[in-house]
Amino acid sequence: MKPLVLISHGDMCVELKKSVEMIMGPQDDIYTVSLLPNEGQTEFLAKFEKVVAKLDDFVVLADLYGGTPCNVIAKQIMAGANYRLYAGMNMAMVIGYLNAEMLGSKADLIAEARNGVTDVNEALQGLIDANS
């Protein structure tokens, strides 16, 4: 599996990995890098570089487009780093990535993220209307 690196403000990425593992089992190829409140861009980048130094090819998912973790890594890409960076990560996106990797196909991470957002009240109303 191509490794996945989750980056976020605070420990959102750490907790997201734990939640995914509740469903998908242990995931040795998911790595996390948290930007903690007392850290700046330099410290975050140093932690990121330490994690990815041992990886040949990987995909990065960030919590928020325009946020510091995403911006720091985007600057690396603009400077010539060669990896994919997606922002707006959610659980459906991570699980979709893992499923695609297991099947040997390419995940459409944007579609996975969008499909993970549902107005449950509207969906339930559709079921109620269909059964009336």
What is each stretch, according to the model?
Residues 2-132:
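N-terminal loops that bind phosphate or other acidic moieties
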